[in-house]
């Protein structure tokens, strides 16, 4: 596996994990936009800022709070609590049995002609964890599962000495959870918090993905916008088109429920 890991940014073009995961077209065109001339809708920043505040609170709970007392309340044995170390030095070997917890660690890794950078939010032992404040739909539909897995795989690529487990875990904190839905639908999250585990790509698979992505960016960066690769439906989180039939046109105007739904327009017309 090629690439070197650095504690501080070495000379070179920085490219973040989150940026690299964006569609190629979006990534290229964003660089051509003068953001100082753009009008920002503050309301669109609410979810992002809530996510930042959540991560900040979790970090401070471990670095500034009485986490030992919190673990005792959760009935962790003192023998486990005594083995926890918060952000121990990465350049020194740990004593046998010690359980490291790393929070908000930024790393840099040289790969081909770029410097890949990412911030590791939470790691316990050798397992990567992340926390997401999101909708219940994101959890039940699995619409972002592949994105979570890819992000975790890229972080492992940057921090191979820390992230050794092949499985990562996402802790979900739902912003729209409703207890009445949990009672009536067993597929709905049964509590305001839940988790999922994802198998990470191998380091070789991740390196192949990186090489392919960078090649795609280089190729399209030379093209005029009209010839650049289009964003796929998957990248746009767009589902297949559906066609609805309403027996009463007034129901359609009011946004009511359709009489029948079709996958193809021709089927709807024939009906």
Regions found by a protein language model. Give the residues of each.
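Acidic active-site catalytic centers that drive phospho-/nucleotidyl reactions
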Residues: 121, 130, 151
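An active-site-proximal "capping" alpha-helix that borders the catalytic cofactor pocket
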Residues: 146-163
């Amino acid at each position: 596996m090629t690439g070197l890991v650095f504690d501080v940014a070495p000379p070179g073009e920085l490219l973040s994990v989150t940026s690299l995961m964006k569609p190629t077209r979006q990534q290229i065109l964003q660089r051509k936009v003068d953001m100082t001339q753009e009008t920002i809708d503050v309301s669109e920043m609410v979810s992002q800022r809530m996510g930042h505040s959540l991560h900040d609170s979790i970090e401070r709970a471990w670095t500034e709070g009485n986490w030992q007392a919190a673990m005792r309340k959760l009935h962790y044995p003192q023998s486990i609590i005594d083995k926890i170390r918060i952000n121990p030095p990465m350049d020194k070997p740990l004593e046998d049995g010690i359980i490291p917890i790393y929070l908000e660690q930024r790393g840099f890794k040289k790969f081909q002609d770029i410097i890949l950078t990412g911030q590791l939010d939470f790691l316990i032992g050798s397992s990567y964890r992340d926390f997401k404040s999101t909708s219940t739909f994101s959890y039940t539909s699995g619409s972002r599962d592949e994105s979570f897995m890819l992000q975790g795989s890229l972080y492992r690529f940057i921090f191979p000495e820390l992230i050794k487990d092949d499985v990562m875990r996402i802790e979900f904190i739902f912003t729209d959870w409703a207890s009445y839905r949990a009672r009536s639908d067993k597929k709905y999250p049964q509590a305001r918090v839940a988790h999922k585990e994802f198998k990470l790509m191998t380091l070789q698979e991740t390196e192949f993905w990186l090489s392919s992505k960078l090649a795609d960016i280089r190729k399209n960066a030379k093209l005029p916008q009209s010839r650049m690769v289009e964003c796929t439906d998957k990248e746009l989180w767009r589902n297949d088109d559906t066609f609805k039939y309403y027996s009463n046109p007034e129901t359609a105007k009011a946004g009511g429920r359709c009489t029948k739904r079709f996958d193809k327009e021709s089927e709807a017309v024939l009906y």
